[in-house]
């Protein structure tokens, strides 16, 4: 018998690198999307931490009145934020090398634009990386599809809305109180609470929380016991076991009797599709609503919809909300303009008797 030995071809460094990047045996999968994701998210995180701690005040409204957002300039964890890029910059691309000096870049809020751009690219690549790993493992692509909902929401808040409003200064500040300020101003200017797509998003988030709690409690309550009464039921589960770990028939029967038969799923695949789709579709609609309101296609307006036979207005809840909106609009950017647009564009009512 003759043995033929062939010399193995030397693998190039590039091929070795490609194999390492795309290997599913790594403790953390990198992937080609990860090559972009990792430096982007590291950059965004590093600059955010530094700016949150030490960034000097930013002239957010472009009127030479800087607003302090960092911890070293008098804020705490609640009030601190990375202040959005100045209204004087608008939508211009504003990297460090476009400013005359580092001090000017910081004064005009350059870190905000740097963080947002790297963050959005990073989370988009994270979504692509989810798809890439699923593809290499032979899985279906729906994990990445589900993650597209928060990616769409973040993109709407940090990119689409500033584009529609004409300035990055209208983006959401990167902080706790800054987030709430953004929400209040958004309600004042766009009446988001009366927008059907926002309502769908609320139903998606709260409904998803309810369904998640219901599903988790039902599964935990219908585990198939593999242990004695003296041991934890959890000890009877072995990772990767072929047998089912809970009795879906028992869970279905319980829930069907609690409400009614057809309110309960008897198909595990349909159930888990529903659990995924409900919040995802709701958040998709919210992101779409934010993106339309960015261009001032606002929530429904029912102000002064009800009048009596004499033509006098009978106030409804819509009128109460409108009064609150005007109050919030008066309070924000108080030095950037004399009157809110809603008040400045309407002729003052007569005060004659």
Swiss-Prot record:
Propeptide segment residues: 345-353
Membrane topology annotation: Multi-pass membrane protein
Binding site for Fe cation: 215, 272
Pfam families attached to this UniProt entry: Photo_RC
Domain of life: Eukaryota
Stored InterPro entries: D1/D2, Photo_II_D1/D2_sf, Photo_RC_L/M, Photo_RC_L/M_CS, PSII_D1
A GO biological process held by the record: photosynthetic electron transport in photosystem II
Disulphide bridges, residue numbers: none
GO-annotated cellular components: chloroplast thylakoid membrane; photosystem II
The protein's Enzyme Commission number: 1.10.3.9
Residues the record lists as binding [CaMn4O5] cluster: 170, 189, 332-333, 342, 344
Site (Cleavage): 344-345
Site feature Tyrosine radical intermediate, where: 161
PANTHER family named in the record: PHOTOSYSTEM II D2 PROTEIN, PHOTOSYSTEM II PROTEIN D1
Complex and partners: PSII is composed of 1 copy each of membrane proteins PsbA, PsbB, PsbC, PsbD, PsbE, PsbF, PsbH, PsbI, PsbJ, PsbK, PsbL, PsbM, PsbT, PsbX, PsbY, PsbZ, Psb30/Ycf12, at least 3 peripheral proteins of the oxygen-evolving complex and a large number of cofactors. It forms dimeric complexes.
Official protein name in the record: Photosystem II protein D1
Organism: Oltmannsiellopsis viridis (Marine flagellate)
Gene this protein is translated from: psbA
